[in-house]
Curated annotation (Swiss-Prot):
UniProt feature, compositional bias: Polar residues: 252-266
Lineage, uppermost ranks: Eukaryota, Metazoa, Chordata, Craniata, Vertebrata
Membrane topology summary: Multi-pass membrane protein
Keywords: Developmental protein, Differentiation, Membrane, Phosphoprotein, Spermatogenesis, Transmembrane, Transmembrane helix
GO cellular component, one term: membrane
Compartment list: Membrane
Role of this protein: Component of the outer dense fibers (ODF) of spermatozoa which could be involved in sperm tail structure, sperm movement and general organization of cellular cytoskeleton.
Protein name, entry field: Outer dense fiber protein 4
């Protein structure tokens, strides 16, 4: 009976160890998943807020830069009178200073007074719409940057609908910037076709595409945080790691353990059956004595 008891005890010890290991793995995976999910959400929030800050600073660079066009590199494909050429240069210079540039010095060209600004709206209506969209983009960019930096304050870390509002602001900002970047070259191409000239676009315009990419990335990160994609990704990875880390012994269900115990108990009985024929009494031998 001693070997039978030893086998039963060893089987019970194995099952208890497997159960303890399963419970330990489940309990250890939950805090890790929670920490990883929260860290991913917080890192995405930090990246989105810093991207919005960089994009807003680049918008300010676009506002104060004067390199939207290169008037010195413009080429006339036909000759104009001197007064017409001067007027064309004035228009090109006003477009090269940007969409929100306001000159207050005395060295500014004569097109900066109110009458000539009205003429600019009548001659370049697309340029005027681009000014409006760029002005709205500046204001909305400031609001978005401020909104994405609010979670740094401890009292505002759990605001309702924070991710949803961030998504709406980001994609509205992307729409306004894309409209500005689309209307500015369209206005220039119309003017080039009308005056039969060619003017190269400056580096200030191409900064706008970098701003567009940054704000689009902010919108994607806000969308991922709002839809809890990080928790879904971490839950799927933890399930895969848990299934791969479990051994074949831990996959045996508890209902199968009694049958294994019964088989272990029956095996010694089967070993004891062949010992019974040794105890059979031999028949009496015939007496050979006289």
């Amino acid at each position: 009976m001693e070997p039978d008891l030893n086998e039963e005890e060893s089987e019970r010890i194995r099952t208890s160890r497997n159960r303890r290991s399963l419970e330990h793995r489940r309990n250890s995976l939950l805090p890790f998943q929670w920490k990883a999910t929260n860290n991913s959400r917080w890192m995405a929030q930090v990246v989105a807020s810093e991207f919005s800050l960089v994009a807003f600073l680049l918008l300010l660079v676009m506002v104060f830069s004067k390199k939207w066009l290169y008037p010195s590199k413009s080429r006339f494909h036909q000759r104009y009178p001197q007064n017409v050429t001067k007027r064309v240069y004035t228009s090109i210079h006003s477009m090269s200073t940007g969409l929100l540039y306001i000159c207050v010095s005395k060295s500014c060209p004569s097109s900066d007074n109110g009458e000539d600004n009205f003429k600019m709206w009548t001659i370049h209506p697309v340029f005027g719409v681009a000014k409006i969209s760029f002005t709205l983009a500046i204001g909305l960019g400031f609001v978005l940057t401020t909104w994405l930096h609010l979670p740094y304050l401890p009292c505002l870390q759990r605001m309702p609908f924070f991710g949803l509002i961030g998504i709406i602001l980001s994609f509205c900002e992307v729409t306004l910037i894309f409209l500005t970047l689309l209307l500015f070259p369209v206005n220039l191409w119309i003017y080039e076709l009308r005056k039969n000239i060619s003017v190269p676009i400056g580096w200030s315009y191409f900064i706008g595409w970098l701003v567009l990419i940054l704000y689009f990335t902010c919108g994607i990160l806000c969308y991922l945080n709002h839809k809890n994609y990080w928790s879904l990704i971490m839950s799927s990875t933890t399930i895969n790691t848990a299934c791969s880390s479990l051994g074949p012994e831990s996959l045996v269900s508890p209902s199968q353990t009694p049958s294994s115990q019964e088989n272990s108990q029956e095996s010694p009985k089967d070993d004891q059956k062949p010992s019974s024929p040794d105890k059979v009494v031999s028949p009496p031998q015939p007496d050979t004595t006289g």
